[in-house]
């Protein structure tokens, strides 16, 4: 009985931690009015953000606006937030692949929406919405991969940094073009880029608006692999690539992602305590007991 109570207490601690991790960065205390900016963005229609969830625990998000190089319209920004909310509540999920329709990843914000949100106040509201959304994407208990075909420009480059891994195809490129627009990244891309490749390399990419091709991205640590297949087969290749990392029970895979999130975002002492709590949710669990019975540790 005592063990049961202890394990349930640990689970409750983990639930509270996960809830805290999924909280948005900004709320009304920061001057963020989500309803107001969504009402503004809803005026700029077109495209879609499509979500599919498969029985193998892999979800796919497709940025679907090919006539605009998969640029985010206002309604697409809203839809992305809704898709992330859906995935936060998907208890059996293990992996996520983010890709763009018709062999192009994403070219950032649609210029029609950008031109209409020209004052700093509304621009910062849009920035806060997208930072909230992409931070929640990064904190999902799913191992995520950005499949980059064609161009990942501006906000598209920022989007790919919110995923755990990046797979690039031959001829693709990542480019932070913000400086050419008289801007800096606003969706969290600069902060995430520094964590990925270091401040010195990040400064070069941002200040020079440099084109990062697959080989260079691999060398920098921005990309994790280069896919060499055909256009019709890249999504299947991405699924095959992620499969070894999500193999096994979903609760174990999700626990692995959670300890990585805590280690990345919390102070050492807090991360250690969180790791202990998450460890308690899988110790003595079904997967652990089955592995012990089979003696699979060194196999």
UniProtKB/Swiss-Prot annotation:
Keyword Oxidoreductase applies: no
PROSITE patterns: ENOYL_COA_HYDRATASE (PS00166)
Stored SUPFAM superfamilies: ClpP/crotonase
Keywords from the UniProt entry: Cytoplasm, Lyase
GO cellular component: cytosol
Highest rank taxon of the organism: Eukaryota
EC number: 4.1.1.94
GO molecular function, one term: carboxy-lyase activity
Key word Ubl conjugation present: no
UniProt-listed InterPro entries: ClpP/crotonase-like_dom_sf, Enoyl-CoA_hyd/isom_CS, Enoyl-CoA_hydra/iso
Signal peptide residues on this chain, from the entry's feature table: none
CDD domains, A to Z: crotonase-like (cd06558)
Family annotation (Pfam families): ECH_1
Recorded catalytic activity of this chain's protein: (2S)-ethylmalonyl-CoA + H(+) = butanoyl-CoA + CO2; (S)-methylmalonyl-CoA + H(+) = propanoyl-CoA + CO2; (2R)-ethylmalonyl-CoA + H(+) = butanoyl-CoA + CO2
Compartment(s) of residence: Cytoplasm, Cytosol
Family: Belongs to the enoyl-CoA hydratase/isomerase family.
Function: Decarboxylates ethylmalonyl-CoA, a potentially toxic metabolite, to form butyryl-CoA, suggesting it might be involved in metabolite proofreading. Acts preferentially on (S)-ethylmalonyl-CoA but also has some activity on the (R)-isomer. Also has methylmalonyl-CoA decarboxylase activity at lower level.
Protein name stated in the entry: Ethylmalonyl-CoA decarboxylase
Organism: Xenopus tropicalis (Western clawed frog)
């Amino acid at each position: 009985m005592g063990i049961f109570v202890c394990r349930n207490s640990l689970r409750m601690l983990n639930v509270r931690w996960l809830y805290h991790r999924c909280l948005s960065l900004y709320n009304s205390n920061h001057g963020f009015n989500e309803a107001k900016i969504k009402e503004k963005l809803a005026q700029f229609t077109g495209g879609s953000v499509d979500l599919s969830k498969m029985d193998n625990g892999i979800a796919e998000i497709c940025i679907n606006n090919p006539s605009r190089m998969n640029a985010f319209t206002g309604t697409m920004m809203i839809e992305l937030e809704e898709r992330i909310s859906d995935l936060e509540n998907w208890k059996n999920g293990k992996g996520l692949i983010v890709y763009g329709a018709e062999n192009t990843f994403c070219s950032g914000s649609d210029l029609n929406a950008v031109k209409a949100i020209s004052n700093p106040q509304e621009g910062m509201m849009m920035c806060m919405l997208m930072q909230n959304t992409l931070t929640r994407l990064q904190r999902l208990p799913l191992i995520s991969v950005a499949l980059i075909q064609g161009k990942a420009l501006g906000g598209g480059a920022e989007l790919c940094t919110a995923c755990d891994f990046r797979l690039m195809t031959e001829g693709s490129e990542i480019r932070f073009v913000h400086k050419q627009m008289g801007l800096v990244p606003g969706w969290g891309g600069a902060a995430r880029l520094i964590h990925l490749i270091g401040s010195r390399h990040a400064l070069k990419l941002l200040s020079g608006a440099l084109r990062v091709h697959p080989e260079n991205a691999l060398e920098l640590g921005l990309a994790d692999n280069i896919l060499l297949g055909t256009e019709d087969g890249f999504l299947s290749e991405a699924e095959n690539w992620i499969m070894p990392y999500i193999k096994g029970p979903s609760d174990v895979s999700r626990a692995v992602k959670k300890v990585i999130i805590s280690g990345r975002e919390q102070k050492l002492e807090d991360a250690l305590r969180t790791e202990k709590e998450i460890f308690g949710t899988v110790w003595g669990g079904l997967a652990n007991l089955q592995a012990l019975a089979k003696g699979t540790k060194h196999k």
